[in-house]
Amino acid sequence: MVIKAQSPAGFAEEYIIESIWNNRFAPGTILPAERELSELIGVTRTTLREVLQRLARDGWLTIQHGKPTKVNNFWETSGLNILETLARLDHESVPQLIDNLLSVRTNISTIFIRTAFRQHPDKALEVLATANAIEDHADAFATLDYNIFRGLAFASGNPIYGLIINGMKGLYTRIGRHYFANPEARSLALGFYHKLSEICSEGMHDQVYETVRRYGRDSGEIWHRMQKNLPGDLAIHGH
């Protein structure tokens, strides 16, 4: 186990998460007692207690007063906020994790984009217009793309869609900085934003589904061609 965290709390958090991931602390089992665990990791019990509370909030553990702390099956109890952690823990599963993330984005955005165009077209067009003054480099496009999907999610009038996109932000923007380094990807995205603006302006709501699905397929093809050059630290740093 290689842990790069800087602070004692950060080290303890990484140690426990990696131990859960590697089944040293297996899901469904009881975590070692506080005193034993603090000595094992090399942190104070106060620090450990803070870390355990944080991990419980993220769904890794269940803490009940007067009972031992239980290790959860995090797939069933955690939220989108652990995406980056999962990518950092298991490099081999990163491509599949990213495919799943992008598939979810495509599937839910066909719904919220159409709803935004129907319910709040002016707001949707305002969001899409931000693409008109974009600088032609990867970082700018990664931010723009995230903000467009997020903006359209909130423009749908259902803030839950926006919260889902918020939960994807960390890993999504890391992918974007790599993906949008490709000029073909930037060109495809601009064409997509322009087409969406056209659809919204002309009220052609029935075209949203196929337009979004096609963009998902086309961008997916570019991404898969690029994956062999995927940097190993895509989601490792900046935890």
Swiss-Prot record:
It is found in: Cytoplasm. Its main location: cytoplasm. GO terms for biological process: fatty acid metabolic process; regulation of fatty acid metabolic process. The keyword Transcription regulation applies. Disulfide bonds: none annotated. Residues 34-53 bind DNA. GO terms for cellular component: cytoplasm. The keyword NADP does not apply. GO terms for molecular function: DNA binding; DNA-binding transcription factor activity; fatty-acyl-CoA binding. SUPFAM superfamilies: GntR ligand-binding domain-like, Winged helix' DNA-binding domain. Keywords: Activator, Cytoplasm, DNA-binding, Fatty acid metabolism, Lipid metabolism, Repressor, Transcription, Transcription regulation. Pfam families: FadR_C, GntR. InterPro entries: FA-response_TF_FadR (IPR014178), FadR_C (IPR028374), TF_FadR/GntR_C (IPR008920), Tscrpt_reg_HTH_GntR (IPR000524), WH-like_DNA-bd_sf (IPR036388), WH_DNA-bd_sf (IPR036390). It comes from the Bacteria. Residues 6-74 form the HTH gntR-type domain. Homodimer. PANTHER family: FATTY ACID METABOLISM REGULATOR PROTEIN, TRANSCRIPTIONAL REGULATOR, GNTR FAMILY. Multifunctional regulator of fatty acid metabolism. This is Fatty acid metabolism regulator protein.
